[in-house]
């Protein structure tokens, strides 16, 4: 199993703690089950880890989708009949985020996307709503106003956004369950 690697940044990583937790859950279920089928327990463990890996990549894809949505809004504003100076020359810091640029060229993530055929296009309303919450936040405003232009600052923005808007998002939990459990729904 290959994980999407990004320097010093983790989201919902399949780490040792998660693996240990899944093993304990499977062992408990194994002993609670009267048949004691070791092969079934092993299959359940691999299935569970596979779904955690899917969720990890799905959340990485959400960051890319949010950035792409921001770019679409910028493009639409520039294409207006009479755009303002701010619309013609917007602050591009969010859409030119170095961390997201790294994700967009990550071969493992792109392979996952093409193999799983998952996308956020079907949930544009969710992406739009989440983006609007992000733009209204102090985290976003401080980032956009900052003169710091580094990979670390870009990565830190996404760490803060993830903790604030993605980590405990009930609507996202529901969407994730739907998409991860029904792979044919997308595309």
What positions do the PLM features span?
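N-terminal, charged low-complexity regulatory/assembly segments
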Residues: 12-172
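Residue-level detector of conserved catalytic or cofactor/ligand-binding positions
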Residues: 178-186
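Accessible peptide chain termini
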Residues: 1-2, 178
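Short, Lys/Arg-enriched N-terminal segments with co-localized hydrophobic residues
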Residues: 2-12
């Amino acid at each position: 199993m290959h994980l999407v690697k990004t320097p010093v940044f983790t989201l919902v990583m399949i780490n040792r703690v998660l693996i240990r937790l899944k093993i304990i859950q499977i062992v408990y279920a194994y002993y609670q089950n009267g048949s004691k089928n070791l092969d079934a327990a092993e299959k359940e463990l691999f299935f569970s880890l596979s779904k955690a890996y899917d969720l990890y990549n799905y959340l990485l894809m959400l960051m890319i989708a949010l950035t792409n949505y921001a770019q679409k809004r910028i493009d639409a504003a520039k294409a207006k009949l009479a755009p303002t100076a701010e619309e013609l020359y917007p602050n591009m810091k969010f859409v030119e985020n170095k961390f997201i640029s790294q994700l967009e060229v990550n071969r493992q993530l792109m392979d996952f996307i093409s193999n799983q055929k998952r996308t956020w296009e079907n949930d544009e309303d969710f992406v739009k709503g989440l983006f609007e919450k992000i733009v209204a936040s102090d985290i976003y405003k401080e980032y956009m106003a900052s003169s710091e232009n580094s990979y670390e600052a870009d990565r830190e923005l996404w760490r803060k956004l993830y903790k604030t808007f993605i980590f405990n998002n009930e609507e996202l939990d529901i969407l994730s369950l739907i998409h991860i459990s029904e792979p044919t729904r997308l595309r």
